[in-house]
Amino acid sequence: TEESWKHCYDTFKGQGKIVMLNLLKYKPMADYTGMTVSNTQKDKTGKETYQYYLKQVEKIFENTKVGNILYYGESQDFLIGPQDEKWDAVILVEYASLDVFVDFVKSEAYQKVTGHRKASLEDSRLLPASNFNIQEVEK
């Protein structure tokens, strides 16, 4: 929502590097209904389509150096957390700053591929985080 973007911006503006934690729940099959996206992954699973999307994002990162995928892997049931909440995968993406992330999301290159993300996911969560300087944490 617009309110959550404003809160994120107010919280992380000027704090340097941020890491975005993504929790992903794939659709059984990709669904492009109502979307105009080139190179649709028709007859592909949500997981296959998300991985196609991720490869396109990696290409953007390689060309622009705006982000870095730190981790992408399958997830299982929570060890601590709601047992009825199920996620298929987790991805951690690092950006130099919140402004860099916002510029990336608004970029023409990203806008061309973001439909694949929407087509592939049943549900998702995006949680921004910034580093603590462990030396500055009170003991």
Task: Give, region by region, the residue ranges found by the protein language model.
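Short S/T/G/P-rich N-terminal loop/turn motif that feeds into the first structured element of a domain
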Residues: 1-88, 96, 100, 130-139
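A short local loop/turn or secondary-structure capping micro-motif enriched for an aromatic residue
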Residues: 78-79, 111-113
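Active-site-proximal segments of catalytic enzyme domains
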Residues: 91
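Conserved catalytic core of Hanks-type protein kinase domains
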Residues: 94-95, 104, 120
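Short amphipathic alpha-helices in soluble, non-transmembrane regions
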Residues: 103-110
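Charge-dense polyanion-binding interfaces
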Residues: 115-139
